[in-house]
């Protein structure tokens, strides 16, 4: 009896202590004093998401409503069977969806809901490119974006909330970091990096894999990009992307990205291979000789390279240069040359 009585007293004391600890933890989470602890769990450094983490479940989604798909249908209706067959080689591949804002919230949500529903039906993962940051392209061919940082963040939050719970990958603002080395951009460097940091945290809180701008192998030094990426919040992202809308081959891009990844503690990366086929002569705007790269696919194995993607839409103009229409518009003759140039190189090889 005395032993059982002491045991009951001991268990009661332990229960009181546990309840007190639970109450203290609850207070920390909901009170202001626990705000820092709560925020620490609200955003997740990419290292926390590496183990057993599938970034592209089901593989890459082929968008049936892409610009090349629309053009293929139009050519078929017009009876241009040869051109339609060439464009089909582009349209049949998974290509990233570009969200370029500003647009109405209704239009944005309509695009996202439609694409997410179709990707879910196909059992694939869509890739979205955000391209609407203030002072986009620093006044060059693709100038534009939101007028204020606040409006950009509001737009980003809408996208993040909509993507939450869906397999989806976000590539955040091509050129936004690498371009800061230009004289026309230097005045916005600190503001830009801080804005990207805020934006990437938004997606991290909603458990969405984000890649930030990593430039390319022939632009900024890896050490320069590593410093900027840290300031832009890369620790809250999956990693970075390289070669978007550019033409450099996989080998130099992979070597550059591996160096940059090493400087960032092993951050993962993806590479745009949409137009990196052999034959490119060095010009960047609708260049002659460019060819489609290898078809996009996710990569397997224990390396930081997650996927080779088609981020830039093959056939979409780089801008009003070399006979092209405005940036992003369909450039038919250029699209056909990308396909035929790849075919020619394959035949020669």
Report residues per predicted region.
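N-terminal carbohydrate-binding/catalytic regions of secreted carbohydrate-active enzymes
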Residues: 53-162, 313, 317, 322-338, ...
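Structural preference for beta-strand elements that scaffold enzyme active sites
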Residues: 96, 123-127, 167-171, 207-211, ...
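Sec-exported extracytoplasmic/periplasmic mature domains
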Residues: 117-121, 161-164, 200-208, 230-234, ...
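Secretory targeting and sorting signals
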Residues: 5-31
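Surface-exposed substrate-engagement region within the catalytic domains
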Residues: 52, 63, 69-89, 202, ...
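Active-site cleft segment of glycoside hydrolase catalytic domains centered on the general acid/base Glu
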Residues: 142-166, 174-208, 222-223
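Surface-exposed cleft-lining segments at the edges of enzyme active sites
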Residues: 95-104, 142-147, 177-188, 209-214, ...
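C-terminal region of N-terminal signal peptides and the immediate post-cleavage residues
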Residues: 23-49
């Amino acid at each position: 009896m005395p032993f059982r009585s002491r045991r009951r007293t001991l268990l009661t004391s332990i229960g009181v202590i546990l309840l007190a600890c639970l109450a203290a933890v609850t207070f920390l989470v909901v009170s202001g004093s626990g705000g820092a602890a709560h925020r620490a769990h609200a955003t997740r450094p990419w290292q926390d998401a590496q183990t057993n983490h599938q970034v592209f479940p089901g593989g890459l989604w082929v968008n049936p409503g892409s610009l090349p798909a629309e053009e293929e249908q139009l050519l078929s209706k017009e009876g241009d069977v040869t051109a339609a067959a060439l464009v089909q080689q582009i349209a049949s591949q998974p290509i990233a969806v570009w969200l370029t804002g500003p647009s109405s919230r209704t239009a944005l949500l309509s695009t996202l809901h439609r694409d997410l529903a179709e990707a879910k039906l196909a059992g694939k993962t869509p890739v979205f490119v955000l391209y609407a940051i203030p002072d986009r392209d620093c006044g060059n061919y693709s100038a534009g974006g939101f007028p204020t940082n606040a409006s950009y963040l509001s737009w980003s939050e809408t996208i993040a909330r909509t993507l939450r719970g869906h397999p989806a990958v976000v590539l955040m603002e091509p050129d936004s970091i690498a371009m800061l080395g230009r004289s026309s951009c230097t005045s916005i460097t600190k503001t830009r990096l801080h804005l990207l940091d805020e934006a990437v945290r938004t997606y991290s809180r909603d458990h969405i894999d984000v890649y930030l701008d990593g430039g390319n192998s022939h632009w900024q030094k890896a050490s320069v990009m590593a410093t900027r990426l840290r300031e832009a919040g890369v620790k809250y992202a999956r990693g970075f992307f390289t070669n978007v809308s550019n033409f450099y081959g996989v080998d130099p891009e992979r070597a550059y990205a591996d160096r940059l990844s090493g400087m960032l503690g092993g951050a993962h990366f993806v590479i745009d291979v949409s137009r990196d086929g052999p034959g490119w002569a060095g010009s960047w705007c609708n260049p002659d000789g460019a060819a489609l790269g290898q078809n996009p696919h996710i990569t397997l194995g224990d390396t930081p390279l997650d996927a080779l993607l088609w981020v830039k839409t093959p056939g979409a103009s780089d801008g009003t240069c070399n006979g092209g229409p405005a940036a992003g518009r369909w450039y038919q003759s250029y699209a056909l040359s990308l396909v035929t140039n790849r075919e020619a190189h394959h035949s020669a090889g």
